[in-house]
């Protein structure tokens, strides 16, 4: 990757994923100001990174401490929180490194800068793959909960969930190494784009199936006698599905501009309009970090148990039932 592309900026970016050819003359643009690289202060990245780290650490602590949250879905949420922490940590460290280099307080060799640049990019890519895989795992967990409710506890045990999480992170680590090895190849970008759209399509299919089933179930309940009510377990399952749907929607909203950026790099690297769009890369990076900040808020908003555990941890209460 071209470290000069990254470290000449005052805010972090993925070099290979953000670099684009020199912009055309102003006469060929829709507006020279619109095509200029967006400047975002390093403090913004650091603030988002710190807030995200604190929030996601709180999520993991809450699940670990509260025995009532020791279920496959919450362990998958912990893994998703770890992925959010990784992208925040990567961007924060890269921001600090860029600030140090720009201040001339340390003299670093180009080879070291290149190496660190690849590591930061690899961390973000690992976080992306881990987020996608964990969201897919949660979607499958909710699918099994709804369609195989009576067999759920034998199909999806805590041990199986933890094993799956371990496999996910091992695969993500391998992907991270491959990203570094093939950092100069555009196939890395193609693989990321393909994985993103394939996973989104698969998860979308699962959720459409789940909500069509829920709609059919509600229609059947409506024709039953007054005694026929929705079982609490069924209501809980659908609530969990809604929560994960919200998470998926936020994920797509925050990451889609970044992936459009990648698509434009591949398909129209010299088009003036594409160049104008890719010039706003730092904005898309801020959106990615915002996703890491928003996710824990969704957990807290949708789960009373998790929200109460947050309060107990923040208040320093030690009367938690460890289950």
From Swiss-Prot:
One of its GO terms (biological process) is sodium ion homeostasis. Residues 64-75, 141-160, 211-245, 302-323 are cytoplasmic. One of its GO terms (cellular component) is plasma membrane. This is Melanocortin receptor 3. The chain crosses the membrane at residues 38-63, 76-100, 119-140, 161-181, 187-210, 246-268, 278-301. Pfam families: 7tm_1 (PF00001). Glycans are attached at residues 2, 16, 28. GO terms for molecular function: melanocyte-stimulating hormone receptor activity; neuropeptide binding; peptide hormone binding. Residues 1-37, 101-118, 182-186, 269-277 are extracellular. Brain. The gene is Mc3r. A lipid is attached at residue 315 (S-palmitoyl cysteine). It comes from Mus musculus. It is found in: Cell membrane. It comes from the Eukaryota. Belongs to the G-protein coupled receptor 1 family. PANTHER family: G-PROTEIN COUPLED RECEPTOR (PTHR22750). It is a multi-pass membrane protein. Receptor for MSH (alpha, beta and gamma) and ACTH. This receptor is mediated by G proteins which activate adenylate cyclase. Required for expression of anticipatory patterns of activity and wakefulness during periods of limited nutrient availability and for the normal regulation of circadian clock activity in the brain. Disulfide bonds: none annotated.
